């Protein structure tokens, strides 16, 4: 396994530990809430939660912010723009956009694990305009066309 090192900065409001993998084979690192006061996410409401960190990714890398399954299953708390994308040229604080799809208000306490961050490599492309596309078995079928 290759381990790559990227820079991370603890900001003034940082709390807890740096993002880390929970197990040897985890794809995502937990992000910790760094809010000064508890944040109440009312039913159906969206809140922006600070993490107290900023990162520097090299070109052709991104960070994806994804929900934690436990928060989603137990409380209906998920990442509103899932997956959120942190571009390689962004140097500000990473913040997580959470939405409450649950049945009761939910409180985000300082130090709570609120999301996962996945680091991914990607490719940049150029579009080649065409009047036709290659045929496939699926064709233009979508939105349940292959079965439910």
Swiss-Prot record:
Q: Could you mention a single GO BP entry for this protein?
A: dUTP catabolic process
Binding positions for substrate per the UniProt entry: 68-70, 81, 85-87, 95
**InterPro entries attached here?**
dUTPase, dUTPase-like, dUTPase-like_sf, dUTPase_trimeric
Catalysed reaction, written as an equation:
dUTP + H2O = dUMP + diphosphate + H(+)
Q: Which cofactor does it need?
A: Mg(2+)
A GO term for molecular function: magnesium ion binding
EC number(s) from the headed UniProt entry:
3.6.1.23
SUPFAM superfamilies with a match to the protein in the record: dUTPase-like (SSF51283)
Q: Which UniProt keywords apply?
A: Hydrolase, Magnesium, Metal-binding, Nucleotide metabolism
**Matching Pfam families:** dUTPase
Give the protein's recorded name: Deoxyuridine 5'-triphosphate nucleotidohydrolase
**Organism per entry:** Rickettsia canadensis (strain McKiel)
């Amino acid at each position: 396994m290759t381990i790559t090192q990227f820079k991370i900065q603890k900001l003034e409001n940082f709390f807890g530990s740096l993002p880390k993998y929970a197990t040897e084979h985890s794809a995502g690192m937990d992000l910790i809430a760094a809010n000064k006061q508890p944040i109440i996410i009312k039913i159906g409401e969206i809140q922006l939660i600070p993490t107290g960190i900023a990162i520097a990714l090299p070109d052709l890398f991104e960070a994806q912010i994804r929900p934690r399954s436990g928060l989603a299953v137990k409380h209906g708390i998920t990442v509103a723009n899932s997956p959120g994308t942190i571009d390689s040229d962004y140097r500000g604080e990473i913040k997580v956009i959470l939405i409450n799809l649950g049945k009761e208000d939910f409180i985000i306490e300082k130090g709570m694990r609120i999301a996962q961050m996945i680091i991914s490599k990607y490719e940049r492309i150029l579009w080649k305009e065409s009047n036709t596309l290659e045929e496939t078995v699926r064709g233009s079928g979508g939105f349940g066309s292959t079965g439910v």
